[in-house]
Structure formats: structure tokens, C-alpha cells
Regions:
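Short, flexible micro-motifs
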Residues: 38, 53-56, 71, 169
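Polytopic alpha-helical membrane-helix bundles and their juxtamembrane interface segments
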Residues: 1-27, 31, 38, 75-79, ...
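A short structural micro-motif
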Residues: 43, 62-65, 181
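Alpha-helical transmembrane segments and their immediate interhelical/interface regions
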Residues: 15-19, 57-66
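A broadly tuned "polar low-complexity/structure-edge" signature
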Residues: 36, 44-46, 73
Length: 194
């Protein structure tokens, strides 16, 4: 019983995370509803384990999920007929450099905040995953297929971090996320051609 009382939030957010990734894999707009609830709960989980960057990122995810839902529901790409959801597309090459610059600035800023204002024991990796997650979530909201590449990297590093920090269910979830992100890329690629 001690195990469950110690890990109940980890278990709950892991279940929600499984639902989220299945919905993302299917390119279902319902992913954004789960994407509001899960990170709201993750905020407390991460904070209680000293993953302050991840806690801050979870707050961002909660807010960004509202944006993602609105873009998927009401946004349209150039040339798309009115109505329907936004199609899956490639990230325009003109956005590569700005995305890389944003990532680098976000990584440096997050690292500085974690080192200066927290007692984080993993500031470099925590900041890295947070900065890349900003870019990944933006790419997901725009329905760019390349978002999967960002998540493969983020998920692999987070799996390691959660093992180190003693959050076993999240670690297993993020290990599974790596596999699903690889499969998701190919699924979305197939969906793009339909």
C-alpha cells in the first residue's frame, strides 16, 4: 500500500499519458483535452521530485494545449477548403533556423533559471528537454510531421531523467513514447499521402 500511496500521481499521469500518445498517434483532436488535464497534474508530480524545469513546462503544456486545440479545430493551411481540421504538413524550411535559434535561447535561459533559482540536480538535461519541448509542442500544434523527431529526442532523455529521479512509471511511459513516436512519424507520413 505504501507503494501506491507514494506513486499514485505517477500512475495516474502515466495512464493519461498513454491515452494522450494514442490520440496523438491517430492525429485525433481529442489529444488536446487530455493535453490540458495531464500536464496540470504533472506540474505537482515534477515539482515534488525537484524537476522544476519540467514543472514549468507542464504549466506551459496546459496553456499550449488550449492553443493546440483551437488551431487544429479552427486553423487552416493555405489552399485548404473551409471546414474540417488542419491537415498534416511538413515544416517549411524557412522555419528551421528560427526554430533552432529559439531552441538555443530557451535552453540557455532555462538552464540559467534552474542553476540560479533552484536546487536542481539535473539542470542541463532538464533545460534541454524543456527547450526542445517548446519547439516540439509548437510543431505539433501546427501539425508538422517533423514534430515526431523532436519528441523522439525529448522522450529518450526524459526516460533517463525519470529513472534517475525515481519516477518509475513516467520513465516507462517515456520509453514507450520513444517507440510510439517512431511509429507515429510513419503513421502521419502515410496519413499525409491520403
Amino acid at each position: 500500500m505504501d507503494f501506491l500511496s507514494e506513486h499514485w500521481l505517477d500512475i495516474l499521469t502515466t495512464i493519461l499519458g498513454l491515452l494522450y500518445i494514442v490520440l496523438e498517434y491517430r492525429a485525433s483532436i481529442a489529444l488536446w483535452i487530455v493535453g490540458i488535464i495531464m500536464p496540470a497534474l504533472d506540474t505537482w508530480l515534477y515539482w515534488s521530485h525537484g524537476l522544476y524545469g519540467d514543472a514549468g513546462m507542464a504549466v506551459y503544456y496546459t496553456i499550449a494545449a488550449i492553443y493546440g486545440w483551437a488551431v487544429w479545430r479552427f486553423g487552416r493551411k493555405h489552399g485548404q477548403q473551409t471546414g474540417g481540421q488542419m491537415p498534416i504538413t511538413h515544416m517549411p524550411s524557412r522555419l528551421y533556423i528560427p526554430s533552432l535559434v529559439f531552441f538555443a535561447v530557451a535552453w540557455a535561459a532555462t538552464y540559467y533559471i534552474l542553476v540560479t533559482f533552484t536546487d536542481s540536480t539535473v539542470p542541463l538535461l532538464d533545460a534541454f528537454t524543456n527547450a526542445l519541448s517548446f519547439v516540439g509542442l509548437w510543431a505539433l500544434a501546427r501539425k508538422y510531421i517533423e514534430q515526431w523527431f523532436f519528441w523522439i529526442i525529448v522522450d529518450a532523455i526524459c526516460c533517463y531523467l525519470y529513472i534517475v529521479k525515481g519516477i518509475p512509471f513516467k520513465a516507462a511511459l517515456y520509453g514507450l513514447y520513444v517507440v510510439i513516436a517512431i511509429a507515429g512519424y510513419y503513421k502521419w507520413k502515410k496519413m499525409m499521402k491520403q
